[in-house]
Curated annotation (Swiss-Prot):
UniProt-annotated binding residues for a divalent metal cation 2: H66, H225, E229
Protein name per the record: GTP cyclohydrolase 1 type 2 homolog
InterPro entries listed in its UniProt record: DUF34/NIF3 (IPR002678), DUF34/NIF3_sf (IPR036069)
One Gene Ontology MF term: metal ion binding
Entry keywords, A to Z: Metal-binding
Pfam families xref list: DUF34_NIF3
Oligomeric and partner information: Homohexamer.
SUPFAM superfamilies: NIF3 (NGG1p interacting factor 3)-like
Family: Belongs to the GTP cyclohydrolase I type 2/NIF3 family.
Amino acid sequence: MKIADLITWFESWANPAWCESWDNCGWQIEPGILHEEARVLVCLTPTLAVMEEAIALQANLIFAHHPLIFSPPKSLRRGEAIADMARLAFTKNIGIYSAHTNFDQVEDGTADVLAQILGLKDVAPIVPTQGGLGYGRVGLLDPFLNLQELLTVIQTRLAPPDLIFSPTADLQQIISRVAVLGGSGAGFISAVAETGAEAYLTSDCKFHQFQESRDRGLILIDAGHYATERPACDRLVEKLRSLNLHWVQLSNQDEDFRQFFVK
């Protein structure tokens, strides 16, 4: 499949026009590769390590969730990450394409995959946007679990390096309704509280957001940005393989940019 055809297929599923105004979805760098057979390296975040991996694997497209460029840089200087990525993209003929908030909303996108991993039933968006799409997912556990069992499921299936949850939570509380949103989801706490969810799995939560959740009677669970979004990259690879692409692989150089000290 040509890269142009691949992008057309993807954008019929997750149109970049659906992204937020502050976001930058779609082509980050297109060095003239649209008519080449697609050799795709999928990653969460486009970094120099991923670019070097793409060069070594002779990939011609880095398909990332996070954008390389959020706002137009005022200058490009050698030694700066974006500048070096751009230089390598053009000299090695490797495109960089990002699907961010558009991919968050769709079926088999970041939130939908999290809901599937937890086995949620009767799933709906936390914040609907259009035609059954929307941010986050909320649904029922089947069977219901107590909080300790739910935390164990999350730890086992997502393998986060650290799992933070509301300190006043009762580990024996039965949880029936769970909300999920991959990546930075603390801004949706008010919307989640209105869904009747008893627990909310997301990431990047601050001190006072845990306080807000406690005051609303919502158990907030922070599994980290990487652990809550990387599974959707795995799913994207599966979907791309179903298209019989010439070559597609999940990056082995993706990074969780946080490290935890263990005594």
